[in-house]
């Protein structure tokens, strides 16, 4: 394979971030495997993108994992149907591709490996031998694209029903309900679906019992109050002890990534709110930032601060629900009612600013929907005066309670290696002592201008530590909001850029060119340059990211959404084996997840 640096947007090179092309890891790879072993792809992801031969994939992955400052986390893994992609000059011939996104904590750098595949040979070796969390990602990639991962321990459907036919993210798979035959649920089909959901321990390498006694197999969910959504865990029990378990997800899957291929860059924004439905504007942030990278838009300072302010309000809102429901899972009811009182005050601020409460869809490509209304500062001031004392009450009344401590300290505990192996992020990772918060490590939207601390645990992540870190994160978010209130910049709420969407309305009555642009961008959608873009943010539950591929049209060619809850649920069996069922309930409460974030 010839070494080749290809820039898909050479005509717009002023906006091309080329720092990642000079990343030291490129030289390390060339020194080890030779100068002609790879194709290095220039993108707007800010990440070195290296196409490797399928035969060298595991060797390259192992090399990166053993470097002096190693790439210790598999952050994401998925695929792409390349067959209809027109802008791919200089890239290896491929009908399909698989990408592997690795993170080095010590370097604070990423690398993305890509493997090109032909349609008649969709096979690639499993990555689970290097990174155990590749398991779910490979299962999902197989069911969405039909790519087989040789050597995978259990390559079966994950998000779709077991009886589903076809691979939905292929370009030749229908994207609309009207393209399917009418659905009918006959009695025979219902029986077939129920039979398909029957758990068979042998399929998972489990024994039904020992010489002396049988194991019990218990369904926890998908409609159990402690499963926090439509989520099923099949437990293998020896009395009350959990011998093993199998999480079963997908009941909340809505095809969010497929929808991205049928919506314009602008009209997809409301869908982002519903990925993690408690996060509100936090969900919009990585998407609009990734699109702005494609467009080459730099937003005004006022926009950055407004976005940070809304994100931190939603972070507090989500954390309050998480902390109170965790306490409820342990057995106390009162904090839930306290939390909903406090969350109402947050919604008062959010609704006054955006016009909506849970799903504002308020961020825009190049800015926000409208400027801050009169009186926003008074509402925020009232909340900031109220909340700190309430946090003290939560700690004193519940979180310092000896019963709660006894139920949660040392439960579902794991260390740094386990957290990295399973792709844990957010408080789940920082509780192990690893200081990695994207707002500090890789600042975006002006976070580098704010004074705040990152709470970090002492080396072991257990249920209690994870919750207490979230409490301290609340205090830090209040610090950030105080700075937003006191230092809100003057200026426009949208960037003056041709791809800002919607364009400034006031110009449409003065210039025919801007009138035409406004009409096209609102009705048809803005056309983004052909390239790839990536943005990760510190969301409410860990790191959330969007990896966008544009083929030079009004819609995304491929929208990949990486969510933190997905990785955290995959880790459940490792964390709870040998524990009691009651410990599992506490652990589920400590993870902080919603199933929409898992299933997308």
UniProtKB/Swiss-Prot annotation:
Pfam families: Complex1_30kDa (PF00329), Complex1_49kDa (PF00346). Disulfide bonds: none annotated. It comes from Citrobacter koseri (strain ATCC BAA-895 / CDC 4225-83 / SGSC4696). Residues 1-190 are annotated as: NADH dehydrogenase I subunit C. PROSITE patterns: COMPLEX1_49K (PS00535). GO terms for molecular function: NAD binding; NADH dehydrogenase (ubiquinone) activity; NADH:ubiquinone reductase (non-electrogenic) activity; quinone binding. This is NADH-quinone oxidoreductase subunit C/D. In the N-terminal section; belongs to the complex I 30 kDa subunit family. In the C-terminal section; belongs to the complex I 49 kDa subunit family. The gene is nuoC. NDH-1 is composed of 13 different subunits. Subunits NuoB, CD, E, F, and G constitute the peripheral sector of the complex. Keywords: Cell inner membrane, Cell membrane, Membrane, Multifunctional enzyme, NAD, Quinone, Translocase, Transport, Ubiquinone. It is found in: Cell inner membrane.
